[in-house]
Amino acid sequence: QPVKIQETGFLGKRPMADAGGSVALVRGGALGDFILTLPLIRALRDNFPRSRLVLVGDPSTTRLGGAAERVSAEAGDWARMYTQDGPPPTLADQFADCRLLVALLPGGPGAAPDVYLENLRALCTQMRVGDSQPEPGQTRHMTQRLLDPLRDEGIDLPDAPQPRIELPSAPAKGDVVILHPGSGGRHKCWPAQHFVTLLAWLQRQGWQVAVLWGPAEEARRGEFPPALSEAATQLCPASAWELALYLAAAKFYIGNDTGPGHVAAAVGCPTLSLFGPTDPRLWRPLGPAARVVQAPACDLERLGVGTVIDATAEALANLEASDEPVEH
C-alpha cells in the first residue's frame, strides 16, 4: 500500500512541547540548496532548544548548519533506507528519541519511493515531508517554500527568513574582491571573457582580485581564459567550511547563480550575483548587502560587461562610503 503522509498537522496545530530528545532534518541537494535551508534549521533550533539536532546530508555541507549530530546520506547505513531491510540498528538507535523528523525531498512525498518513506517513518513517526523544488507558478523565495513543513504546525517562523552561517570567530575583513566565473551548470555561466574584462577593470581601480574555483569547475579550469585560470591569486577551498572563511574575509563577491554566492551572502559578504535562466525571485542569495543583476531575456550571453561593471562600481562605492562595516 502507498505510504500516506498526513495532510493535517501532526502537531495538532499547536506548538509541540520541547521535552528534549532529538529533532532531525533530511536534506540532500547542492551547496546552495542547503544554505537556503538554514532558516528552517534555525527554526528547529529556536523552537526545540532542549532537543539534539540531527542533520542528514553531505557532512561537509551540513557543517555550515552549526552544532549538530551529522549523518552522511551517502554512507552505507543510510543507503539501506531505500531497501526493504528497514533502518539499520545504528540508525534506529540514533533516532530512538526523535520527536520530529523533517525530510525535504525533490517532488515531495508523492515523488519519493514508498519504501524510503516507510523507513523514514520507522525512524520517527512524527514526520513531515516537504518539497525541495518550486511549485508551478511560484514567485516567493525558496526559503519560504522550504519552511512549509513547519508553517501550519504552530511553530514560530520568521517573517523574512534569511540564511546565516555562524562562524566561531569572524575573519578580519580585507580588501580582496572574489570572482567566481564557474557554476555547476554551464547554462548559468556569464561568458568567461566578460569576467576577464571585469577582472582587468577591478585591477585598474586598485583592487586585489582573487579567482575562486569550486569542485564543479576545478576539473575544467583549463577551459577558462589564462587571465582567469592563471590569475595571481587562486582560491581552491578544500571544504564548504573553508569556502565560508574565505568569503567572510572578502570585501566583495561577484559570481554566477551558484552555491558560493549563497554562502557569501550568508556570512555577510556583500555580493553581486549574475542570473540568467533561473528566477532570482526564487533563488537569489539573501544577505545584508546582496545584489542581483538579471540578464536580458534570461540569457547571460546578452548581459553586457558594462552593465556588470556599473553595478560593481556602485556597490563598491557604497561600501567605501560607509563608515560602518556590513553587519552579519
Regions found by a protein language model. Name each.
Residues 1-328:
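Catalytic machinery of carbohydrate-active enzymes
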